[in-house]
Amino acid sequence: MDVDLQLFKNIMAESRHNSDLLDSFSPNQFLSKEKIIKLIRDQLILRTDSEIVIFGGWYGSILIPAFKQITAIDIDPKVISKAKYKIFKDYNVDFISKDVFDWAPDSSRIKNTDLIINTSCEHMPSMKKLELDTNAYFAFTSNNMYDIEGHINCVS
C-alpha cells in the first residue's frame, strides 16, 4: 500500500488535539482494515467506479484512500467534521453525520452502492435489523471485546 504523506501529516497534526484519533489508526485497526481491503480486492467484486458506503466511519481509516468513491456515515458530528475538514480534506469522500439506522433504509445511495462496509458492528444493533433495498455486497466485522464501554454487539 502506498503511503500518502499528506494524509499522514493531517493525522499527526489533528492527533495533537485529539488522542482518540490515534486509536482509529492503531496497529489493530490498521491490520483489520488492511485485511478487509485485501479480501475485497481478491473477490474482484468492484469496478473502478464502484460506490462504497462505510457505516460507522469514525474518523475515517485506510479504507478511504483504498477506494475511489466513498460515502462515510457516522452518528458523531464532531468526528465527521474532523474527518471531512482536517484529515481527509483532499479526498473525494461524502461524509454524512447521521444514525445509520435512520439514514440507510430510505437512501437512494444505498440502492445504487456496490459495497457496504461496517467495521464498527460492535457499536451498533444487529445489522439484521437494518432492512436495505440493495444488491450490494456486505463486509461487516465486529470483535470480542465485550468489556469495552459502548460495545453492544460483540461476537466470539
Locate predicted features.
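S-adenosyl-L-methionine
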Residues: 1-48, 75-115, 119
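Conserved SAM-binding motif I beta-strand of class I
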Residues: 69-74
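A short acidic, amphipathic alpha-helical/loop segment
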Residues: 65-66, 106-109, 126-132
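C-terminal substrate-binding/active-site "lid" region of AdoMet-derived donor-dependent transferases
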Residues: 125-156
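Conserved acidic residues
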Residues: 50, 68, 111-114
